[in-house]
């Protein structure tokens, strides 16, 4: 089978939004080539060692590659992708160069591209993320393994916003907690909360592609008895109180439901947020304070920010 590789040269800020557009267009996988992966300290990744080829990475910005089946609808699909990406300007998302190119690859090249960019990554004291085809032996009995299907948007490691959310969940989720994951995407944060002992996790996403992917990954990690995945717009119509709410989405979207998050959290509960670029940090902080939260932590990794807010 022939595949067409669509390559988009963009910014860190636009990665998650463009990845979502590509999945909705039916991409058979997304690869993220981020030059930060070449220069970041290995200590940040708990000793993970991966051989990376500098020739695969841009000097600046990020390259997102996706694979589309070559068929009679390819031209129309590519035009729809371009239009959807251009529309991101309406949300004040910086697209950078926004250079889009196409090339053809065969089935074997497509499979090789995946394996080149997808490796086990230890992202916190407890969590290691492992692609489904790799055999990985835990270093200790306390290490928690999250298996992920390669159909998700993954780069050579894990996106900094996901890493910071995982680290915050590890710190704040307690056995018996009730957790809500807003904009669950692949479901990775919901899976982590379940593995940390949460009694129940509600994984919410408006995108039906994300809902299907999250359900597959939840089942793959055998936590479907704890995690319920459903299609939902943010926290609309959600009434069950929570001990922890986590949201790894754009700052503008976080600000739309800070009031709902405050309403649903129990006293002493925490709202863990990321997907925030440095330029939007103060906006998110101000919005959380206005909703009644106290700011407990602000963490930074590369150009990204995570905020942990406490409901007094």
UniProtKB/Swiss-Prot annotation:
Highest taxon, organism lineage: Bacteria
Any GO MF annotation of the entry: protein-lysine N-methyltransferase activity
Catalytic reaction equation(s): L-lysyl-[protein] + 3 S-adenosyl-L-methionine = N(6),N(6),N(6)-trimethyl-L-lysyl-[protein] + 3 S-adenosyl-L-homocysteine + 3 H(+)
Disulphide linkage map: none
SUPFAM superfamilies assigned to the protein according to its UniProt record, in alphabetical order: S-adenosyl-L-methionine-dependent methyltransferases (SSF53335)
Annotated EC: 2.1.1.-
Subcellular location: Cytoplasm
Residues bound to S-adenosyl-L-methionine: 162, 183, 205, 248
Keywords: Cytoplasm, Methyltransferase, S-adenosyl-L-methionine, Transferase
Matches recorded under CDD domains: AdoMet_MTases (cd02440)
GO BP annotation list: methylation
Signal peptide start and end residues: none
Major site of localization recorded for this protein: cytoplasm
PANTHER family listed in its UniProt record: ELECTRON TRANSFER FLAVOPROTEIN BETA SUBUNIT LYSINE METHYLTRANSFERASE
Protein family per UniProt: Belongs to the methyltransferase superfamily. PrmA family.
Protein name: Ribosomal protein L11 methyltransferase
Organism: Geobacillus kaustophilus (strain HTA426)
Annotated gene: prmA
């Amino acid at each position: 089978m022939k595949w067409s590789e669509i390559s988009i040269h963009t910014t860190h800020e636009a990665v998650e939004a463009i990845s979502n557009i590509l999945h909705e267009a039916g991409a058979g996988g997304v690869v993220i080539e981020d030059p930060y992966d070449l220069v970041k300290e290995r200590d940040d990744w708990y000793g993970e060692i991966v051989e990376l080829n500098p020739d695969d990475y841009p000097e600046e910005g990020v390259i997102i590659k996706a694979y589309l089946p070559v068929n009679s609808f390819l031209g129309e699909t590519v035009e729809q992708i371009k239009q959807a990406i251009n529309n991101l300007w309406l949300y004040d998302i910086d697209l950078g160069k926004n250079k889009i190119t196409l090339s053809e690859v065969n089935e074997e090249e497509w499979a090789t591209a995946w394996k080149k960019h997808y490796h086990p990554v230890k992202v916190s004291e407890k969590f290691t993320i492992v692609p489904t085809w790799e055999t990985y032996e835990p270093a200790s009995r306390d290490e928690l393994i999250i298996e992920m299907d390669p159909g998700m948007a993954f780069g050579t490691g894990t996106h900094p916003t996901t890493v910071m959310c995982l680290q915050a969940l590890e710190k704040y989720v307690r056995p018996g907690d009730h957790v809500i994951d807003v904009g669950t995407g692949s479901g990775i944060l919901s899976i982590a909360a379940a593995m940390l002992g949460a009694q129940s996790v509600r994984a919410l996403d408006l995108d039906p592609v994300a809902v299907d992917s999250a359900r597959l990954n939840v089942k793959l990690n055998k936590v479907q008895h704890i995690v319920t995945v459903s299609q939902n717009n943010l926290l609309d119509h959600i009434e069950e109180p929570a001990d922890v709410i986590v949201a790894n989405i754009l700052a503008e979207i976080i600000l739309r439901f800070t009031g709902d998050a405050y309403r649903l959290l129990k006293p002493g509960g925490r709202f863990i947020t990321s997907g925030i670029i440095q330029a939007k940090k103060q906006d998110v902080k101000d919005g959380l304070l206005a909703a009644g939260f106290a700011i407990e932590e602000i963490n930074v990794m590369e150009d990204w920010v995570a905020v942990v807010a406490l409901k007094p």
